[in-house]
Amino acid sequence: MHMIYRVNVERCIACGKCELACAFAHGSEGKPSKTRINIFRRGPELGTPVVCFQCDDPACASICPTQALVRNEVTGAIDMVRERCILCRMCVAACPFGNMLWDETYHCIQKCDLCGGDPRCVPFCPTHALEYVPEERAAVRPEPLIREAV
């Protein structure tokens, strides 16, 4: 069963719990600056989660000279093969959404990898603005999904 990561911006309260969960899940000691999901804060308790779209035809993967970005057949995520990456940052420049990040501390590329099929940000979202749902349910409005889960 193929899963879809979905963001409902109407529900985001910009609490930052997803950023912290991501940072801890990826070993950056909870430093929000090292997260793969970022909240664009539009006001108090109003935000837009920004995360890799795992594009069908990803510009980041197309431009990579070493094919270091490949689709994970299980999760559908565009994964980084670190052994192939030459740190040219062409993928960072190519992403039209700004979701490929350069980590100055660790000198590596960062992007959402869906945590190997179990995105750690999702269960920490108190308003269910982030969801990881089966593809066939992805077109359904979030409200019925939440009621079904309760």
Give the predicted meaning of each segment.
Residues 2-8, 23-24, 28, 34-71, ...:
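Flanking helices and flexible, charged tails adjoining ferredoxin-like Fe-S electron-transfer domains
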